[in-house]
A protein has these predicted regions:
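Extracytoplasmic
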Residues: 1-105
Length: 105
């Protein structure tokens, strides 16, 4: 498929997938919430970890209905420079998600 704009979404995400980004600078003021945009089917549980794929979990969101946006409240304010990993899990092995973009505030 061809996508408009400067980026393309990550597609066909299945349970057990992890998508990581190195390195994000949260600055000194930090972030206390995050937002993920895409096509996320109901039943997905998405976790945000920092510093490594099996690092500290800073937030988990359970998607209760098909969503275009998932909002995360971070367990603590994140400051400084960190790698960020989004983990996707669901009990329905047939479900697939699409990850378009994210932001931290």
């Amino acid at each position: 498929p061809v996508y408009e704009g400067d980026s393309s979404p990550v597609v066909d995400i299945q349970s057990g997938a992890t998508i990581g980004f190195k390195y994000l600078n949260f600055g000194t003021e930090g972030a206390s919430k995050a937002e993920l945009t895409g096509d996320i089917p109901a039943g997905f549980k998405i976790s945000i970890r920092i510093d490594s794929y099996d690092g500290k979990t800073v937030s988990v969101a359970e998607v209760s209905e098909d969503s275009k946006t998932v909002v995360f409240e971070l367990g603590e304010e994140i400051t400084g420079r960190h790698a960020v990993y989004f983990g996707f899990n669901t009990e329905n092995a047939e479900d697939r998600a699409v990850f378009d973009c994210f932001r931290f505030e």
